[in-house]
Curated annotation (Swiss-Prot):
One Gene Ontology term from the biological process aspect of the record: amino acid biosynthetic process
GO MF term list: 3-dehydroquinate synthase activity; metal ion binding; nucleotide binding
Gene: aroB
GO CC entries: cytoplasm
Compartment(s) of residence: Cytoplasm
Organism from which the protein derives: Methylacidiphilum infernorum (isolate V4) (Methylokorus infernorum (strain V4))
Cysteine disulfide links: none
Location, primary (coarse class): cytoplasm
This protein's name: 3-dehydroquinate synthase
Length: 358
């Protein structure tokens, strides 16, 4: 296997599958589908913003005698809704798909989440392949089988654990991604460095000189390892992937899923978690400063602007990881050593919101 082609295995109790990484994979979609022995009729869902890439994949599938039927989904977090879910499953029924049929979803995390959820419930479950087109979805949401939609009250409150058949990552699609979206994706890569891998942080700090293919590969490896150990968040191991997400999700909900990108919210959440870790666990000041410098290096925010404390607190109370009225926070004892804490007091939360709400 040469450096341009990497296959990372994800092993879970419900399914083992490969994440395939390589430049030009979109043009090889037909061949990859043939290797998977997919049925001829394929539902190809794509984000309207990446129609060009969807067309490339459709052409490849047709060249290998598949019959892709395309459905465009509007871009944006608003598509993680019951309305979009209904649109998708209705279209699947009209396409006359059966239980051996497959969905291929081309787009970012929003499309992957709602397409995966549709796959999990249509005919009580059909297979799906994810083709992530944003950096964030490549390194995070496409791996691990979390699917779902949002409610007005909070993010990902309706969904399922349902693993894909495969994930195809073609880094060439990132060439058309805006710098802001690249930075948003980098937030999740930074997360992996903070919870697991100092060497990954070293590479991240090189910025323009960093090896993007390596950053993607290493992030996928870390997530695959964690998901393999705790697919359905039963043991607590998978919870470490929520570093920065407890507050991050609350900020997104309080913002109405509008101006703040997921990666930006996670960046603020990681900053907050480091400050709390310093306050409660003596997490080193220099490590907090290191995170701040990395976030600033990628133009990621440290504070949320224009949000009310009341709205953020209400959103925190709807956190889906809440148990018996208690919210779990992922804190760090040191870089690479995360812990789950349920001992965050109201005073701690009041303090941290003063620190990160501008």
């Amino acid at each position: 296997m040469n450096a341009a082609r990497m296959n990372i295995k994800v092993s879970t109790p419900s399914r083992n599958y490969f994440v395939r990484i390589g430049k030009g994979l979109l043009q090889e979609g037909g061949s990859l589908a043939r290797q998977l022995k997919l049925e001829k009729k394929i539902a190809l869902l794509f984000d309207q913003a990446v129609e060009t890439y969807a067309t490339t994949l459709i052409d490849s599938l047709k060249a290998h005698d598949f019959e892709p039927q395309a459905l465009a989904i509007p871009s944006g977090e608003g598509s993680k809704s019951f309305k979009t879910l209904e649109t998708i499953v209705t279209a699947l029924a009209e396409m006359k798909l059966d239980r051996k049929s497959t969905i291929i979803a081309v787009g970012g995390g929003v499309l992957g989440d709602v397409a995966g959820f549709a796959a999990s419930i249509f005919l009580r479950g059909i297979s799906y392949v994810l083709v992530p087109t944003t950096l964030l979805s490549m390194v995070d949401s496409s791996i691990g089988g979390k699917t779902g939609i949002n409610l007005p009250q909070g993010k990902n409150l309706v969904g399922s654990f349902y693993q894909p058949l495969e994930v195809w990552i073609d880094p060439e699609v990132l060439a058309t991604l805006s710098p802001r979206l690249i930075s948003a994706g980098m937030a999740e890569i930074i997360k992996y460095g903070m919870i697991s891998d100092q060497k990954l942080l070293d590479e991240i700090e090189k910025k323009e000189q960093s090896d993007l293919l390596y950053l993607i590969k290493r992030s996928v490896e870390i997530k695959a390892e964690v998901v393999g150990e705790d697919e359905r968040e039963q043991t607590g191991r998978r919870a470490i992937l929520n570093f920065g997400h407890t507050l991050g999700h609350a900020l997104e909900a309080a913002n109405g899923y509008k101006d703040l990108l997921h990666g930006e919210a996670v960046a603020i959440g990681m900053h907050a978690s480091c400050l709390l870790s310093n306050r409660l666990l003596s997490f080193p000041d220099e490590s907090t400063q290191r995170l701040k410098k990395i976030l600033q290096l990628y133009s990621l925010p440290l504070k949320a602007r224009g949000l009310s404390k009341k709205d953020v607190l209400e959103a925190l109370q709807l956190d889906k990881k809440r148990e018996r009225g208690t919210i779990s926070w992922i804190l760090l004892q040191k870089i690479g050593l995360p812990i789950t804490s349920k001992d965050i007091t109201k005073e701690d939360i009041d303090w941290i919101l003063k620190e990160v709400l501008a």
